[in-house]
Amino acid sequence: MRALESLDKVGILDKAYTRCDQLSGGQQQRVALARTLNQNPSIILADEPVASLDPVTARQVMSDFVRINKEYKITILLNIHHVDLALNYCDSVIGVRAGEIVFDGPASSITQEQLDEVYNGTAVPTTEKSDN
């Protein structure tokens, strides 16, 4: 029963009886998140959770993380290389370059200069903010 509740929390209860290999990449990612939620964690560590997803699905998965963080008070720690998603969906950002922390603070306060330092001038963040 908890498994079905976890699938419902991530919006894919209707896929409960579908084989995982028949699900889209985004749906598979949500199954992974549901499996994690089923364990009642206090923290979720996610390594590149949107790396192979299309932009729409990536935003949907990021929204799932934000909602889970806020509704269930679960800390979410993401390793993500999509700067625009990190800035739009995360409260805090830690920017690392060559093993050294370049920035550690609110996503809303990171500057282009700091992003350039992290990415050697290749980062081009979006200015659009999400409604989280």
List each language-model region with its residue ranges.
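Conserved ABC ATPase signature
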Residues: R19-L23, Q27
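Conserved catalytic motifs of ABC-family nucleotide-binding domains
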Residues: N40
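Catalytic Walker B motif of ABC-type/P-loop ATPase nucleotide-binding domains
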Residues: I44-D47
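Helical segment within the ABC ATPase nucleotide-binding domain
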Residues: R59-E71
